[in-house]
Amino acid sequence: TLGDHKKWGYYPGMIWAKLMCIILLTPVKVEGRENLEKGQSYVFAANHTSTYDIFIIYGYIGRSFKWVMKEEIRKIPFVGAACKAAGFIFINRKAMKQALHSMEEAKKSLTNGVSVVIFPEGTRTKTGETGKFKRGAFKIATEMNLPIVPVSISGAFNVWPTTRKYPIPGKLTMVIHKPIMLHEDPEHREEQIEEIRNIVINGIV
């Protein structure tokens, strides 16, 4: 499959996502790419207000990555097929054994600068507001000792809210913040995750 190779698992999807953004008249402004170190693997943690978040990150994050996403994404037309072809990791939240296996597969992907993208809220918001970040979403970062990169996406909820069947034209912004290492002490981790959430929220325009 496309996902069997770092290069071909990423670039076709990137081109596809950028073309979709151009065709659908949704220009994307990106800030903060200079915060990333070449060759370093990261765990990107983004807010999730719309299915369109997938197009924005896929097309404009500028890094080869695997996606950790919920099983339901498979069923979304075009999006699900492309993500499966790229070898992304689907999590079945209703089947813990399968979910743990998927997480192990995700960890194997984090080599040679390949990163992982997560939506710590676990699902799309129905209001446009950023929900609580779930601690389990950061498990890969703690086990692999990888830095978390908060990502703020703006405009996607207006372009494609849950109430609309299709997206509409609109301007989008993605801010890539400076990497953060999670604290080794679990007692401080909850506070740090909330700090990451606040960084994401403050970056939304």
PLM feature spans:
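Non-catalytic C-terminal accessory region of glycerolipid acyltransferases
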Residues: 100-205
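Residue-level "edge-of-site" marker
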Residues: 34, 96, 154
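Generic preference for hydrophobic
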Residues: 30, 44, 67-68, 174-176
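Active-site phosphate/pyrophosphate- and oxyanion-stabilizing loops and adjacent acidic/basic residues
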Residues: 18, 55, 138-139
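A generic structural signal for well-ordered alpha-helical segments
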Residues: 20-21, 83, 109, 141
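Catalytic core of membrane glycerolipid acyltransferases/transacylases, capturing the structured
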Residues: 1-14, 22-24, 37-96
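General small-molecule cofactor/ligand-binding pocket signal
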Residues: 29-31, 89
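Membrane-interfacial terminal anchoring regions of lipid-handling membrane enzymes
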Residues: 1, 7, 11, 34-37, ...
